[in-house]
């Protein structure tokens, strides 16, 4: 219990940091709203606003028309959120890096915050470095680099998250250390991971924590904590945002699933590209029930595979965390199924199942481990493809999952009905209830798949109502062709080629997509999922 309390405390810090990363006015707006709610004679209205804040992780909501609008008195968020100066655009960054190539590594680091070189910013960073000597010790040369920067508001520089968020990360480390001390004898591997990850938060180098996380034997509890995913960076698509997930392992389901993970090399070798790699015959796959999620992880997140770092994955592998009480939740699945049934012809409506969703999701996560990891010239995909990197990587993983399905059927992982359910969920995944915004990589790549599938005859309008028919006999051929294109883009690392590909397949026709979206809106009971946790205050 002591360890859990400490881990939850660390998670709350990740939540606050994430909200701070998203919007500079978020925390003040939340505090004001809390005070209004406490003082309200009739708290229903403020309670509704608190629910909105909780659902959208800040003071900006997504409307039913997919617009982003503040619902508290705050400004609109910047594309780069608070990780870049307000008003900074990509051309200015590109120009700056062309004239200051030595700044490239720090400006483009996934865990750095970009600032303008004002006297106030530089003085504040140096003062914080004085206040947190532990950060200075873990970042040799940082002080000298900051002192060497000339004051120039037109110039840019970057500081590590460890300095920008030193007070919060120092406190989070203390909580992780205390949790580790409480479980040292019971689960030494988990304790070692917590010690390492606490240090990682302040060093910015996650290798020690990643290594002990992926290779350790933890027992019942697991914790994902730190800054990994960059989906919220709509400027460059490279900055990582904070999250935490406290998870309880379902041992029986985990063992059954691990026994099935035996054909990874065969699945890798079957992918439609020439540059195959050796993959580990076993990767840690765990089925968990979510105890609490924080920050970017909060919501109906079904699964995760980490670490993202290609070098860490090569050396230590990756860990897959399946969130069973989200993925297998009957109410959530029923809402998903309603969307599918609203747009497919009657004879296809029973093809979707919870098991099909589970398997497609599982192999999507494993798909991140397979295929291209770095470009032909050795660059990371994030560096090469920038704001398109997440979109292309997520599409690759969707397609790897579908491409693997026939192999899974051949080895007896599931039967013909299981294969069909896996495929049906692949179509369900592409359905959109509104037109995606340009900064929504998940929804955009789903729409692109739908359009490719439609143009290549995998799905087509059926009957007078123009409901969708699924041509299962075309499935593997069409998926293979699209996956081949995606792998080619990743290997080439060509930004302009990738942009042309996205522009080609990212389109919306109200007569087709709009009509299907209307059918979904008419049938779906809910447009969002508000996830609450029994162990938390949930506001």
For each feature predicted by the language model, list its residue ranges.
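Contiguous, non-catalytic segments that form substrate-binding/exosite surfaces or channel walls
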Residues: 158-349, 353
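Long, well-structured alpha-helical subdomains associated
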Residues: 402-498
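Post-HEXXH active-site segment of zinc metalloproteases
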Residues: 372-395
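Active-site recognition of the HExxH zinc-binding catalytic motif
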Residues: 356-373, 397, 402
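Short, glycine/acidic-rich hinge or "gate" loops at secondary-structure transitions
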Residues: 188-195, 278, 379-381, 410-425
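Extended, compositionally biased alpha-helical segments that mediate assembly or anchoring
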Residues: 487-539
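An active-site-proximal "capping" alpha-helix that borders the catalytic cofactor pocket
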Residues: 187, 390-407
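N-terminal helix-rich structural modules
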Residues: 1-185, 189-193
């Amino acid at each position: 219990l002591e360890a859990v309390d400490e881990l939850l405390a660390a998670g709350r810090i990740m939540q606050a940091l994430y909200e701070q990363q998203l919007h500079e006015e978020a925390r003040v707006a939340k505090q004001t709203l809390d005070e209004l709610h406490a003082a309200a004679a009739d708290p229903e209205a403020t309670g509704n606003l608190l629910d909105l804040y909780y659902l959208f992780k800040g003071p900006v909501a997504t409307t039913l028309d997919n617009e982003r609008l503040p619902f508290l008195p705050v400004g609109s968020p910047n594309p780069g959120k608070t990780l870049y100066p307000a008003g900074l655009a990509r051309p200015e960054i590109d120009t700056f890096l062309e004239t200051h190539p030595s700044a490239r590594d720090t400006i483009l680091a996934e865990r750095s915050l970009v600032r303008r070189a004002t006297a106030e910013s530089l003085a504040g960073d140096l003062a914080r470095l004085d206040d947190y000597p532990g950060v200075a010790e873990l970042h040799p040369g940082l002080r000298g680099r900051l002192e060497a920067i000339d004051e120039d508001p037109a110039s840019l520089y970057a500081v590590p998250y460890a300095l920008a968020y030193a007070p919060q990360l120092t406190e989070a480390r203390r909580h992780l250390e205390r949790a580790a001390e409480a479980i040292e004898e019971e689960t030494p591997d988990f304790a070692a991971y917590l010690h390492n990850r606490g240090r990682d938060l302040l060093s910015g180098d996650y290798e020690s924590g990643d290594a002990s996380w992926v290779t350790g034997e933890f027992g019942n509890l697991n914790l994902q904590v730190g800054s990994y995913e960059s989906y919220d960076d709509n400027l460059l698509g490279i900055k990582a945002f904070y999250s935490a997930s406290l998870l309880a392992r379902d041992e029986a389901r985990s063992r059954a699933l691990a026994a099935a993970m035996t054909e990874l090399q065969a699945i890798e070798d079957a992918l439609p590209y020439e540059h195959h790699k050796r993959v580990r015959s076993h990767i840690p796959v765990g089925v968990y029930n979510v105890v609490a999620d924080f920050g970017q992880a909060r919501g109906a997140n079904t699964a995760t595979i980490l670490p993202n770092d290609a070098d860490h994955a090569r050396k230590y592998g990756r860990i897959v965390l399946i969130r069973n009480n989200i993925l297998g939740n009957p109410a959530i699945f029923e809402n998903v199924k309603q969307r599918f049934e609203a747009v497919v012809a009657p004879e296809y409506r029973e093809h979707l199942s919870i098991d099909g969703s589970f398997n497609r999701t599982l192999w999507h996560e494993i798909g991140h481990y397979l295929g291209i990891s770095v470009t032909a010239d050795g660059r990371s995909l994030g560096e090469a493809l920038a704001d398109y990197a997440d979109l292309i990587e997520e599409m690759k993983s969707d397609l790897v999952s579908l491409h693997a399905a026939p192999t899974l059927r051949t080895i007896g992982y599931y039967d013909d009905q299981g294969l069909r359910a896996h495929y049906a969920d692949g179509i369900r995944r592409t359905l959109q209830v509104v037109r995606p915004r340009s900064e929504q990589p998940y929804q955009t790549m789903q729409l692109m798949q739908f359009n490719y599938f439609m143009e290549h005859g995998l799905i087509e309008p059926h009957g007078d109502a123009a409901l969708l028919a699924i041509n299962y006999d075309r499935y593997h051929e069409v998926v293979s062709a699209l996956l081949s294109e995606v792998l080619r883009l990743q290997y080439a690392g060509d930004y302009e080629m990738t942009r042309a590909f996205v522009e080609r397949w990212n389109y919306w026709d109200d007569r087709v997509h709009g009509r299907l979206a209307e059918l979904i809106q008419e049938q779906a009971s809910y447009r969002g999922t508000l996830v609450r946790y029994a162990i938390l205050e949930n506001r």
